[in-house]
Amino acid sequence: MSAAGRYLVGMALTESKDLALGTPCPDFRLRSVDGKTYARDGFREKPALVVMFICNHCPYVQAVEDRIIALAREYGPRSVQLVGICSNDPTDYPDDRPERLRARAREKRYGFPYLIDETQDVARAFGAVCTPDIYVFDRDRRLAYHGRIDDNWNDPKKVTRRELAA
């Protein structure tokens, strides 16, 4: 397992199951917080697809949220499609209820679709077990990168390496 696939969640180290580089992007078809349905193949015209497992309640996502939004603004005009997916059970995490996801996306002006994985089937297909969990797929929708956004989740002023830089 690469270090990029390891995350501290609470006080426990949680590892996402690495998809091997070159693995095809798992298929998905999910409803977004705005009521539209999006599918993996609906982004075919984009040369890259960035799938981000995120949510509202996670302090690690909250810490990098503005950087995720900046990535969407930076890469969107370059025809890179970013997609956020929340796979949490809202019964366990009330902040991740659809209406709260929608409110957060509007409040923060997410520049990407924010999808709801109600069954967690998509998260399982990706092997995503924590947030944020970032997957970058190339034009052929083969995995090119899996890991973090940068090297300091807590303090953007202390970032020395941006893994998702052009």
Q: What kind of region is each of these model predictions?
A:
Residues 5-165:
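Chalcogenol-based redox active-site neighborhoods
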